Amino acid sequence: MNCLEKITAAAALTAATLLPSAACTSWIIHKSVSASGRMLVQKCRDSHRRPLDADVRRSRHGVKWMRIGMFKHCALFAVSERGLAAIMNDGDDLTVQHPNVARPEINHAHSSIACAEIMRQIMDECATAEQAVKLILHYGRNKTQVGRGQTMFVADPRRAFMVDLGPGYAEAKEVTGGIIIITNCLHLPGIEPLSRKAVTGVRSDRSREANVRTELKKRRVNGKYTVKGTIETSRLRCRKEIQGKYPCRRNSLGGTCFELDPEFPAQLTTAYIALGPQQHTVYLPTPMTIEQFPKEIFDTSWADLAYKLSEREGYDHRFLARIAAFEEKILPEYEQVREEARQLLKAGKKTEAVKLLNDCYARQYAEALKLLKEIDAESVKDPLKGEKIPAEV
């Protein structure tokens, strides 16, 4: 693939420098077990309290895609108008190094590439999940980060894959049904034995995966998994009365659920985006039709509101029910608008469908921002420190 050689050493070095270490929880819900019949890809991002931002970009081929990440540059979550979604989790430190480490004549930083840059390449160059897997395997086996393992999910409306990769190694597995959950340990046979993670660390990661699976199952409707259940699960956190680990942690940065539409991916694929700790912000339905995010999303002031609330109120706080009630209102509203847009698209009325979706987003965005600002003001006026966030999570 000639496109693989077009990445510059400078871009690779920049991405590798900017990408922080993290401890994330992600899952894929296969279309065969989702209530909507669509693929769901969820990522909960943890790191070092760096705010998430988002923007809309165009590939060199003119394909529109949404980037959610950090520093207004790196992509940690992404979805394109082709209905292709990708996310990445940090995995284990490995017992191996990149083959070029032993070659002093090679500038090592310029021969490696971070997953955040691979994400950008996926959005720029790939139309399907299968193509994305081939690209990831290429980088994993040739140019990936030194000594560090990663796990990536890629999915389109029809197929989904999990990929474990490390320096000189990469393995892929197709998700053909059910749900698959990843935290921060590698899983696939070709690379998992190379892990340097202690048994206690692996046990903790697998505990988080098992707990997420249990909680998602509890929230099924008629035996099927829903976006609402995914959002609720993403907000669960470790507490003394609940054994094990959960997705919402002391260093949570936010979450996103991609719902991939097979019929009209460029219009009806949806990103449910929460910037800031999941308990302290709104999951906002965002259609693929928007041309750009509002400035509060890009400049991180939206996420900053959530961070301030988490610092004042702690977790399981007094405003959480109000946030959940707001989502109970806007999620069905959006679903209704999306189905109205679907009928317009079937009738060949693309302009009207796009306007309907974008107007809904603008209205719900304004309502959500107003709510978060009201909560922020109330929290400042009447501070009430919530439950202390446990140091271990």
Residues of each region from the PLM?
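Acidic, contiguous internal or C-terminal segments within carbohydrate-active enzymes
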Residues: 112, 121-127, 133-139
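Hydrophobic h-region of N-terminal signal peptides that target proteins for export
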Residues: 8-21
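C-terminal, well-structured catalytic/ligand-binding subdomain of enzymes
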Residues: 23-124, 147, 155-393
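Bacterial N-terminal signal peptides that target proteins for export
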Residues: 1-8
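Short arginine-rich
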Residues: 141-148
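Intrinsically disordered, low-complexity regions
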Residues: 1, 15-16, 191, 386
